[in-house]
């Protein structure tokens, strides 16, 4: 929407500069795209009158004129002097008021007018066209001014060219601002000024001629007004003031009738259309187009109308596409003397998208698609009638109206709560100011309650299609109050450190440990294949889904192994030889004593197969074994700072190899298990090579022992190695625990570094090589101190485990 600042100031005149006004409009949500002068920079151009006009003696296309400038005088023109100017414009004629650039004048582009001689005749200036002073891009001849234009007056002052155009890029919801009326209302509200609207009075009919109006599509056209105007002067011209206002809004002057309808569109934001009365057959009918009905538009293009297109028709034919484009056959021409003037409300949904179906986009369709004021039709037709009668003359008949009250948009009731307003804006605006803003916007406002319980009951006018709910009113109050006037307040919150128990071990630590050990995380479904699960957990009760995705995903998993092993098969089938996967998630174990009859436990599980490390020329190939995966599990348990508290013991698990399986406990509580998959299961599942697997309860490994700080001794440590011979069925773990128990405070580290069976060791026995590190924080240990500890350890091992020192 482009408009002239001076035209806007006729309605409302805030004490703001052009730039400040544009900024204010932008900050109110109506973005200004540009502010441009309405004419080029020029000086020394005044109004003159052609008092003599004759042919050039040596040029057929030139004329020699004498121009009167009235009482104007300058350094190059004396008062009352007739200025000789040679002109080539075809429309130059005797008595014409023109724009004269005298010698010394400067035109746009820094073009200076000098005395010249054209084909032997001196010329002391130039008669200017609109394009030469920057009023138009091109022109057919010199500029013709009104007959009452005062001689000698500066053209810039006469045409009020010290003006700018402001181009506003309106969003689709602000159709109410597609006219000076709506824009002025906004500026008035922003500056707390009254808006001076032009006085519109009903034009009394002087003839009785009417045309009947019938509306078949009431929902699409709830209101249609028409008026006959007869006896207009087809030779009348549009007054310069109107031409200039149209031009500054980006609209070209065509003829007085079209110019008036365009003027109403720009002034009130209401599209109108005029038909040549002589070309209408009978009454007006507002209907939808018939199948394959054709219409030649004003641009002389013929279109085949679609059945959903609303048209204005007479008894025999379609006359226009309603709200979009007029028809050529019924259009106003230079010979038109009688008019039928249309002012209608077309529903936005009836016009929306229709113009684009025909490759069109008009100022009229642009406004109807966004919605116009459904109460403005009478004002529009009366204003247009008044202007037409003053410009082209004629006699007006009575206004004929057809309407469907049930389909005309009604006012809306929306409540605005004080508590919600303050919450959304984050700033308290006084009650009186809120009421004033809403009232100035054209809303009818009543209030109830006080304080935070205050409610504004707002009746929204029908032309504000965008106001539907409470937040729409909040937006209106905020933008009119001014977003810049809302103080910047940093968010305030009561900050409290989240309690983080030092004993809590994060799951991410466990995951990262496995990733560091070359595992990759997998995510599998919680519902699994019942056949595979039955192989891993034979005889165990499962939860069956009532509506499974498929039969292969019909039960809930009893462990994470089912999904991981199927992922292992999937990857091995794609030539992946070395695979290391882990997963965390829930398992679902039926348990009548649990909530909802199911015990849901968070688990972490892993599976490995293939080589211990990737192939490399510097390393010997070695397949993974039980101790590889046990080492991975021990790395996880080490994160708890209490790895010694976990016990690995021989166990039997249905899915695992009977001789390569261990269960993990802590203080007698089951933690998990680790081992080699049963060879029979490897065969049934289609796995290649040895597969090793583990699963732990996260609840038992996500609690870590809080370490206790001890002094670092500055005295040397002493290492003593013991080779202990015990029966083969004695666990090394029991040996280490016993040594730790009797080693006393001097024992700071203990390590099993060798296990030997063979020559020199009796059958049924094994040799354990154990390193003991002894140190004191207060002194250097003497040999006697060390010997006492070693003797005590050896004696206890002999007594408790029947162990002996190896020879």
UniProtKB/Swiss-Prot annotation:
Subcellular location: Cytoplasm
GO cellular component labels: phenylalanine-tRNA ligase complex
Annotated B5 domain residues: 409-488
Reactions that this protein is recorded to catalyse: tRNA(Phe) + L-phenylalanine + ATP = L-phenylalanyl-tRNA(Phe) + AMP + diphosphate + H(+)
Binding site for Mg(2+): 466, 472, 475-476
GO MF annotations in UniProt: ATP binding; magnesium ion binding; phenylalanine-tRNA ligase activity; tRNA binding
Main location: cytoplasm
Pfam families recorded: B3_4, B5, FDX-ACB, tRNA_bind, tRNA_synthFbeta
Co-factor requirement: Mg(2+)
Family: Belongs to the phenylalanyl-tRNA synthetase beta subunit family. Type 1 subfamily.
Protein name: Phenylalanine--tRNA ligase beta subunit
Species annotation: Colwellia psychrerythraea (strain 34H / ATCC BAA-681)
Gene: pheT
């Amino acid at each position: 929407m482009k408009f002239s600042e001076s035209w806007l100031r006729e309605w409302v005149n805030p004490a703001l500069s052009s730039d400040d006004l544009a900024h204010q409009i932008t900050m109110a949500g109506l973005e200004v795209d540009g502010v441009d002068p309405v004419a080029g920079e020029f000086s020394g151009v005044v109004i003159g009158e052609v008092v003599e006009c004759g042919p050039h003696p040596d040029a057929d296309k030139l004329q020699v004129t004498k121009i009167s400038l009235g009482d104007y005088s300058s350094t190059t023109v004396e008062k009352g002097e007739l200025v000789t100017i040679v002109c080539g414009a075809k429309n130059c004629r005797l008595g014409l008021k023109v724009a004269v650039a005298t010698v010394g004048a400067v035109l746009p582009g820094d073009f200076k007018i000098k005395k010249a001689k054209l084909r032997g005749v001196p010329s002391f200036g130039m008669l200017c066209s609109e394009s030469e002073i920057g009023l138009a891009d091109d022109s057919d001849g010199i500029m013709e001014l009104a007959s009452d234009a005062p001689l000698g007056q500066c053209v810039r002052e006469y045409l009020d060219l010290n003006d700018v155009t402001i181009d506003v890029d309106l969003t689709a919801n602000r159709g109410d601002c597609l006219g000076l009326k709506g824009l002025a209302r906004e500026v008035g509200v922003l500056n707390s000024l009254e808006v001076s609207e032009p006085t519109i009075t009903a034009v009394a009919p002087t003839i009785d001629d009417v045309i009947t109006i019938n509306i078949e599509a009431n929902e699409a056209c709830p209101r249609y007004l028409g008026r006959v105007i007869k006896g207009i002067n087809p030779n009348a011209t549009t007054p310069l003031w109107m031409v200039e206002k149209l031009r500054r809004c980006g609209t070209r002057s065509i003829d007085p009738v079209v110019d008036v309808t365009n003027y109403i569109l720009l002034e009130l934001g209401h599209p109108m259309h005029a038909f040549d009365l002589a070309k209408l057959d009978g009454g007006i009918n507002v209907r939808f187009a018939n199948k394959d009905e054709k219409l030649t538009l004003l641009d002389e293009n013929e279109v085949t109308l679609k059945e959903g297109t609303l048209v204005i028709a007479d008894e025999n034919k379609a006359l226009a596409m309603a709200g979009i484009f007029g028809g050529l056959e019924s259009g106003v021409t230079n010979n038109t003397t009688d008019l039928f003037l249309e002012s209608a409300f077309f529903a936005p949904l009836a016009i929306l998208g229709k113009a684009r179906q025909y490759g069109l986009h008009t100022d009229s369709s642009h406004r109807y698609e966004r919605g116009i004021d459904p109460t403005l039709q009478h004002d529009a037709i009366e204003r247009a009638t008044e202007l037409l009668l003053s410009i082209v003359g004629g006699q007006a008949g009575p206004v004929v109206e057809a309407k469907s009250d049930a389909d005309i948009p009604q006012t809306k009731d929306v409540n605005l709560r004080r508590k919600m307003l303050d919450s959304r804006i984050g700033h308290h605006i006084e009650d009186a100011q809120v009421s004033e803003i809403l009232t100035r916007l054209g809303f009818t406002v009543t209030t109830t309650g006080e304080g935070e319980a205050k409610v504004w009951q707002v009746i929204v006018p029908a032309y504000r299609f965008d106001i539907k709910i409470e937040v729409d009113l909040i937006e209106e109050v905020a933008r009119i109050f001014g977003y810049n006037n809302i103080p910047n307040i940093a968010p305030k919150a009561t900050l409290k450190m989240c309690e983080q128990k030092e004993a809590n071990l994060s799951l991410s630590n466990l995951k990262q440990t496995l990733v560091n050990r070359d595992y990759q995380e997998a995510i599998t479904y919680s519902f699994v294949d019942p056949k595979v699960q039955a192989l891993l957990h034979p005889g165990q009760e499962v939860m069956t889904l009532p509506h499974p995705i498929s039969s292969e995903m019909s039960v809930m998993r009893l462990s994470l192994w089912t999904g991981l092993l199927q992922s292992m098969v999937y990857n091995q089938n794609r030539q992946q030889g070395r695979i290391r996967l882990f997963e965390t998630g829930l398992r679902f174990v039926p348990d009548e004593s649990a909530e909802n009859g199911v015990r849901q436990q968070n688990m972490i599980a892993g599976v490995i197969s293939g080589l211990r490390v990737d192939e490399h020329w510097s390393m010997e190939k070695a397949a993974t074994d039980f101790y590889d995966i046990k080492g991975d599990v021990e790395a996880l348990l080490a994160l708890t700072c209490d790895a010694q508290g976990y016990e690995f013991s021989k166990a039997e698990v249905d899915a695992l190899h009977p001789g390569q399986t261990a269960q993990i406990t802590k203080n007698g509580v089951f933690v998990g298990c680790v081992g080699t998959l049963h060879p029979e299961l490897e065969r049934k599942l289609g796995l290649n090579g040895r597969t090793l697997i583990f699963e732990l309860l996260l609840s038992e490994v996500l609690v870590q022992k809080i370490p206790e700080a001890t002094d670092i001794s500055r005295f040397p440590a002493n290492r003593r190695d013991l080779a202990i011979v015990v029966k083969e069925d004695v666990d090394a773990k029991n040996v280490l625990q016993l040594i730790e128990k009797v080693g006393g405070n001097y024992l700071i580290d203990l390590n099993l570094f060798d296990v030997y069976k063979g020559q020199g060791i009796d059958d049924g026995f094994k040799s354990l090589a154990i390193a003991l590190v002894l140190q004191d924080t207060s002194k250097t240990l003497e040999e006697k101190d060390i010997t006492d500890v070693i003797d005590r350890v050896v004696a206890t091992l002999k007594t408790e485990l029947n162990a002996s020192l190896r020879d």
